[in-house]
Amino acid sequence: MSAQRAERKEIVQRGLWFEEYEVGTAYLHRPGRTMTEADNVLFTTLTMNTQPLHLDAHWSSQQPGFGGKRLVNSMWTLSTVVGLSVSQLTLGTIVANLGFTEVSFPKPMFHGDTLYAETKCVSKRVSASRPGQGIVQLEHIGRNQNGDVVCRAVRATLVQCDPAASGDGSLDDGAA
């Protein structure tokens, strides 16, 4: 049996190397994540965000515009959208999160809504100052179960190049 094990091919789960990102490609992250009341209250209290629209059911029931429901914390929504992308894109291959731009929340999330995420590779370039690494710009989109966009953010990441690649910069696609 050990001889069979030695001969089998093994693949370790990981994100994408810099070279594997395709500019313009949309990566769909499944399954989605149903947002629960417990998730929202825990995240909201852990981050010291005491807004009653997240925590106070009675107060929220008296506010116009949301049907008396409490809103899911938008930072939880953003964190979950990024989190849903990790196993497919950046697991073990990201060096650093360089920053977010263009963050928006066009529609609210409520307890019981399911969040689905997708990520588009906007651009990529080999790092001029960090050999063996590249900068990948990603656009994350979160949608609820009805397909409504509830979160959008553009993120710059520093990603490892494939250790087996040449590393001479010839993989730069010129975008960015």
Regions found by a protein language model. Give the residues of each.
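HotDog/MaoC-like acyl-thioester-processing domains
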Residues: M1-V23, F105, M109-T114, E118-A176
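Hot-dog-fold acyl-thioester-processing enzymes
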Residues: S2-L98, A164-A176
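Generic structural detector for well-ordered beta-strands
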Residues: L28-T34, S104, A156-L158
